């Protein structure tokens, strides 16, 4: 036997496979203020103990692999490994558990949502020992929060830029989402803005198609904004979607928007990717642009209650990556959103400090310190009859976005915008007078419609429209 072979043998390295729980299940571990904490909903395969399943998640999302390797001896696994420190059964579910995992902060690159997700969810979701796995929540430590810029501007700066206070902001997605020429698209924008909306919006899949190239759309929308501002005396905006096939093209579009002098651009942050989104957010802060975020593709990731990533995690990630608005569901419209859970992640978007509250799906106390907040956007199947509920549920710091609920008005876009603005102002006035919008909302709308024919027509059109289906999500 050669001396080199003898040296390897004397190290004491023992090859083979051993249970993850021997190394990565540590119920006595006391979490540190600097740890990133994760709550996973774990559904083990039959015969796999929950401790082994939780430990496998901790291992495969940090330092572990399927077998012992000799290079483990070249570093301090105890310093760098993830730890499953607690497991609790899910009430009412068979063989399903919440596994809590702590990750040392040194595992993550500063200021990179991309790296954080690559580590925590990048590989473990295909693990054979698990039937299903869902990331329910993350606790981001202050030490890591401070490595991110976050939203380009935040709620208060946006209000100051727009000179709009004391009420939710009103928006509208231009429909049909695809097929309009740039000039007709700009005309629709102008009609909505002059009628009383604060914003109009590109739909998420409006990029630069043959029927409407991005530069033409940007120019005609800018013309519409300036014309509506001159007529109304209010600051207006249109979410110009800068999402593109490459980061370079995305930045070219954002730069052109800045040159036009418009106040806001837009990005599809999940399909575009976190690296692109963070790059755009930094540019927007440096150049005075607001950034509207659409969550296209989120339901592919978050809708199944046993597998994937809950939207509250995607919302936290967006606040870190950067965005001034993000779509958050409506509770009352056509897209899914259970009230308490939706308001849980709305608070995670807006507030500085959010206490743990399992009844709202918040597994960890989250301190955002000085990071600006994000305005939640309620959009999808809403109309004037929903205005009291939306005002009561979301409060002033929100954007209420009516696409079909504006453009579907029987008299046209501008009257549709008037109807929404009148309904909103009536609801805010009633709330400020101490009226209960949850009980008196319909009466508030009826009273306002007596002096607004535009609102009366909208009330008649949508009086029978409801979207009532059971929610998929559970706490």
UniProtKB/Swiss-Prot annotation:
EC class name: lyase
Comment on bound cofactor: Binds 1 Mg(2+) ion per subunit.
Catalytic activity annotation: 2 (2R)-3-phosphoglycerate + 2 H(+) = D-ribulose 1,5-bisphosphate + CO2 + H2O; D-ribulose 1,5-bisphosphate + O2 = 2-phosphoglycolate + (2R)-3-phosphoglycerate + 2 H(+)
Residues with the N-acetylproline modification: 3
Protein family according to the UniProt entry: Belongs to the RuBisCO large chain family. Type I subfamily.
Misc note: The basic functional RuBisCO is composed of a large chain homodimer in a 'head-to-tail' conformation. In form I RuBisCO this homodimer is arranged in a barrel-like tetramer with the small subunits forming a tetrameric 'cap' on each end of the 'barrel'.
Descriptive protein name: Ribulose bisphosphate carboxylase large chain
Organism: Ceratophyllum demersum (Rigid hornwort)
């Amino acid at each position: 036997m050669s001396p080199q072979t003898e040296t390897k043998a004397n190290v004491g390295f023992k090859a083979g496979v051993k249970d993850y729980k021997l190394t990565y299940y540590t119920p006595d571990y006391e979490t540190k203020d600097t740890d990133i904490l994760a709550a996973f909903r774990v559904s083990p395969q039959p015969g796999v103990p929950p401790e082994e399943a939780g430990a496998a998640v901790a291992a495969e999302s940090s330092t572990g692999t399927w077998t012992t390797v000799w290079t483990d001896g070249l570093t301090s696994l105890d310093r760098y490994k993830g730890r499953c420190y607690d497991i609790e059964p899910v009430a009412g579910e068979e063989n399903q558990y919440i596994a809590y995992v702590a990750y040392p902060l040194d595992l993550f690159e500063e200021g990179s949502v991309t790296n954080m997700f690559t580590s925590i969810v990048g590989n473990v979701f295909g693990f054979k020992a698990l039937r299903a796995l869902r990331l329910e929540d993350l606790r981001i430590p202050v030490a890591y929060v401070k490595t991110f810029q976050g939203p380009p501007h935040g709620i208060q700066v946006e209000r100051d830029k727009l000179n709009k206070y004391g009420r939710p902001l009103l928006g509208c997605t231009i429909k049909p989402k695809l097929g309009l020429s740039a000039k007709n698209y700009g005309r629709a924008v102008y009609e909505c803005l002059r009628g009383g909306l604060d914003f109009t919006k590109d739909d998420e899949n409006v990029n630069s198609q043959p029927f409407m190239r991005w530069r033409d759309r940007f120019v005609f929308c800018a013309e519409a904004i300036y014309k509506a501002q001159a007529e109304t005396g209010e600051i207006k905006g249109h979410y110009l979607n800068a999402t593109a096939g490459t980061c370079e093209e995305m930045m070219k579009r954002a730069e052109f928007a800045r040159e036009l002098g418009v106040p806001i651009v837009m990005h599809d942050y999940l399909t575009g990717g976190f690296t692109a989104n963070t790059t755009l957010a930094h540019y927007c802060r440096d150049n005075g642009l607001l950034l509207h975020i659409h969550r296209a593709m989120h339901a592919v990731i978050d809708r199944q209650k046993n597998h994937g990533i809950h939207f509250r995690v995607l919302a936290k990630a967006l606040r870190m990556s950067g965005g001034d608005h993000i779509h958050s569901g409506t509770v009352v419209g056509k897209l899914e959103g259970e009230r308490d859970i939706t308001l849980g992640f709305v608070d995670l978007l807006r507030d500085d400090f959010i206490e743990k509250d399992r009844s709202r799906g918040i597994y960890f106390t989250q301190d955002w310190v000085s990071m600006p907040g994000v305005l939640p956007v309620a959009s999808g199947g809403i109309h004037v009859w929903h205005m009291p509920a939306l005002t009561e549920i979301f409060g002033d710091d929100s954007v209420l976005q009516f696409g079909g609920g504006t453009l579907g008005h029987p008299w046209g876009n501008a009257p549709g915008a008037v109807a929404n603005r009148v309904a909103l102002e009536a609801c805010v006035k009633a709330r400020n007078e101490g009226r209960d919008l949850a009980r008196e909302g319909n009466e508030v709308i009826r009273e306002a419609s007596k002096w607004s024919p535009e609102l009366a027509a909208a009330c008649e059109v949508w009086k029978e429209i409801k979207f009532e289906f059971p929610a998929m999500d559970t706490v």
